[in-house]
Amino acid sequence: MRIDPKASASAWLLSGLLALGAAAPVGAQAAEPELPAEQVEQIVRDLLLREPELVLQALEQLQRRQAAEQARRQQESIAANQAALVSDPASPVGGNPEGDVTLVEFFDYRCAYCRRVVSSMQALMQEDRQLRIVFKELPVLGEDSVRAARAALAAERQGRYTPFHFALMTSEDLSPDAIRQLAAELGLDPDQLEQDMNAPEIQEAIDANYRLAQELGIEGTPAFVVGDELIPGAVDKGRLEALIADARAG
């Protein structure tokens, strides 16, 4: 059946209703080469008056199809970008670098939801000695976020990424002076850190993360990738442990 594009809002509902086995009068229209918008809308109205519960069924069916299609596309994208996810030399690695499962985290230092999972990430690193964690700086919340991401990647050059990362995650102040002070407290050279923050490779690494996030359909932080699963949002430790166990099992 071809339907006038002007009827698109009603058309997808009609197609869902038809898929659920809606009444015969609709089938009588299917032989026509094209249905105008007014006719489609009238068919939908008639169906709604006769069997309103079909609307919910059609919507649920559409949502299931959309969710399945989104999951399929994400898995394909994860497979296509596997090297960028787990093997990018510009992305710092925590936990066991030789671990048997890799957990990738996309985050922003100003993101309240990212801060919620800090304790879970620290606990996972301590408890699971075979877990490898890849940190993907994804500063999306303004200038302070970008500055903190640059500083963290610069700290990697001094071999202090992980402690500096977690310190930034719990710091309320991400100003230049606060970052310098934090670096000094953790035994980094603040002057060297500041110099390295402006290295072009640092911005290139962040830009690569932006592109990768877009490829994967990541729309916010935090987001996690384990195996072929992408999990958005501040998931709890138990959920992460289950995903890691699934990846390890199979």
Residue ranges and their predicted role:
Residues 83-101, 125-126:
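A short beta-strand-turn-helix
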Residues 88-92, 119-120, 210-211:
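A generic local structural motif
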Residues 2-3, 12-15, 21, 25-83:
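N-terminal targeting signals for export/organelle localization
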Residues 1-6, 103:
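N-terminal secretory signal peptides that target proteins for export/translocation
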Residues 31-45, 182-250:
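C-terminal cap of thioredoxin/glutaredoxin-like
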Residues 33, 37, 41, 48, ...:
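Solvent-exposed, acidic/flexible segments
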Residues 104, 109, 115-189, 194, ...:
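Structural alpha/beta surface segment adjacent to cysteine/selenocysteine redox centers
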Residues 10, 16, 81, 106, ...:
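Intrinsically disordered, low-complexity proline-rich regions
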